[in-house]
Amino acid sequence: MNPILSSLFALSLLSSLSPSTHAHQCHFPAIFNFGDSNSDTGGLSAAFGQAGPPHGSSFFGSPAGRYCDGRLVIDFIAESLGLPYLSAFLDSVGSNFSHGANFATAGSPIRALNSTLRQSGFSPFSLDVQFVQFYNFHNRSQTVRSRGGVYKTMLPESDSFSKALYTFDIGQNDLTAGYFANKTVEQVETEVPEIISQFMNAIKNIYGQGGRYFWIHNTGPIGCLAYVIERFPNKASDFDSHGCVSPLNHLAQQFNHALKQAVIELRSSLSEAAITYVDVYSLKHELFVHAQGHGFKGSLVSCCGHGGKYNYNKGIGCGMKKIVKGKEVYIGKPCDEPDKAVVWDGVHFTQAANKFIFDKIAPGLSKACKRQ
């Protein structure tokens, strides 16, 4: 059955969307991305040190700034649009911004958390900071590009900013930060309106800078991720039949409902904007619930990690090594078949899972420039 897209082009698992044919009705000369580790292509690595091996091993052959064994959804989006992979704004080495820039960094929240990376594990590059980075990039890039030469080939053309696709995948860390701070799910729920308000303000600010095409992912089922499940003891009654923590998934759904409603309102106020709300929650949840039916061997267990029910240990992360009998060996080692795993390291999805998600949402890219 053909999918029926709402005025927001909301994409869900219930729509039987076929994989991308790479034939797009929309032409985007650039992508500007904002978010967290779900779409970070090297921002946090540039700021605080490279994510080491075995990250990147399934595709790049070496670490590539991504907390994944290979490509992220944003990489597949770039590929499908015929664009190069996005360089991280924070990465000064080997970057090319002619077709956009990536302002996402792992651990980034929408709201500033007023803590350091070492204190909380969350990035200081919140969404408002990412917007300031974009604002400065937008203005300075054209000044520098006017010098000609190599600058002209490494920076976007001025009209790329109004024709670009602006992508967002952020919000997960705002929810988990509250939970990790010993707040109840109910307490975190009361913060959702303010979180969404700040999210919408960022979009309005980008619109004010000429952005017109927005592609917004909702947040995933955090109650199915080992780093959240293992953080605190949960009552048996909190788990659903698939092993996920129901109250936390409900929290994510509450966030998504508020986000969708805010986008509906925003479309009426930003008359020239085309805003696509993308339901990745349903797709990710489908992978956790019916992993084997989609060619995966497991769902909750991490591919890369160490010990425990979920092959996850906060103190022994993916890629961690130690000296054994004079030799350096992996303790947080990867599984033999990452292409059969849903979760890479207890926090992030594998390249195979990202490809599954992308294939389902890809048809919406051909409509992401359409206003209704």
UniProtKB/Swiss-Prot annotation:
Listed GO CC annotations:
apoplast
Q: What residue ranges are annotated as transmembrane?
A: none
Enzyme Commission number: 3.2.1.51
Q: What InterPro entries does the record tag this protein with?
A: GDSL, SGNH_hydro_sf, SGNH_plant_lipase-like
Q: Name one GO molecular function term.
A: hydrolase activity, acting on ester bonds
Q: What does this protein do?
A: Hydrolyzes alpha-1,2-linked fucose. Also active on fucosylated xyloglucan oligosaccharides.
Protein name (Swiss-Prot/TrEMBL):
Alpha-L-fucosidase 3
Q: Which gene encodes it?
A: FXG1
